[in-house]
Amino acid sequence: MVTNLLTLALPKGKLGQDALQLLQAAGLPVEGVATEARQLTFTFPAPGIRYLICRPTDVPTYVEYGAADLGIVGKDTLAEAGADVFELVDLGFGYCRFVVAAPRERWEEAGRSLENLLAGSRRVATKFPRVAASFFQERGLPVEIIKLHGNIELAPRAGLADLIVDIVSTGRTLKENDLVEVAPIFSSTARLIANRVSYRINYRRLTSVVEALKRAAGQGGEKIATTN
């Protein structure tokens, strides 16, 4: 970590683009910063800020290990990473939901009961094994988690799994694959996170940025200030 720079890790993609809009609204420099460019670092010496453009799944790692002081990441990614960081502010954008989904016909045959649905095969396909395992363990439902890297909706059709755990925004993809939501897990939005050591050592400087982002995001209440 470069000591004279405050380093902020940003995710590539739509979430990163929304994050840049928030940073600009908070009065932070973003001129020329692009989350889809080949350039992966952007430095502004005058205010002493550097941005790292990362894969969304890597943002918690950069923050946890001190390569970045702060980071913006989806709660879904943060929960799956299990990173030891401070979760400071719910930024409110990038909304999606974690859900358990099943084939419509099987759900009806099971009397719309998750326990009945799991009476036979207990395979669950997901890109988020940590989140999925936690959900079923908390309910005392033994399952076999199968990790996939994409197109989770294919798993029930191919006979690989009976249930899936995935994130949805509109639910359109589930409907197109004749899947229905059978249980909510939690809602996800973008979060501002901080390296635990950096937040304590550079508390005053980081707090000024945190408060500016809170105001820009319309967060008038207290910071979340939890760890994962």
UniProtKB/Swiss-Prot annotation:
Gene3D superfamilies assigned: Periplasmic binding protein-like II
Location (main, coarse): cytoplasm
Pfam family, one: HisG
InterPro entries per the UniProt record, alphabetical: ATP_PRibTrfase_cat, ATP_PRibTrfase_CS, ATP_PRibTrfase_HisG, ATP_PRibTrfase_HisG_short
UniProt keyword annotations, A-Z: Amino-acid biosynthesis, ATP-binding, Cytoplasm, Glycosyltransferase, Histidine biosynthesis, Nucleotide-binding, Transferase
Superkingdom of origin organism: Bacteria
Enzyme kind, highest EC tier: transferase
Role noted for this protein: Catalyzes the condensation of ATP and 5-phosphoribose 1-diphosphate to form N'-(5'-phosphoribosyl)-ATP (PR-ATP). Has a crucial role in the pathway because the rate of histidine biosynthesis seems to be controlled primarily by regulation of HisG enzymatic activity.
Matching HAMAP family: HisG_Short
Cited PANTHER family: ATP PHOSPHORIBOSYLTRANSFERASE, ATP PHOSPHORIBOSYLTRANSFERASE ATP-PRTASE
UniProt comment concerning the protein's domains: Lacks the C-terminal regulatory region which is replaced by HisZ.
Name used for this protein in its record: ATP phosphoribosyltransferase
Source organism: Moorella thermoacetica (strain ATCC 39073 / JCM 9320)
Gene behind the chain: hisG
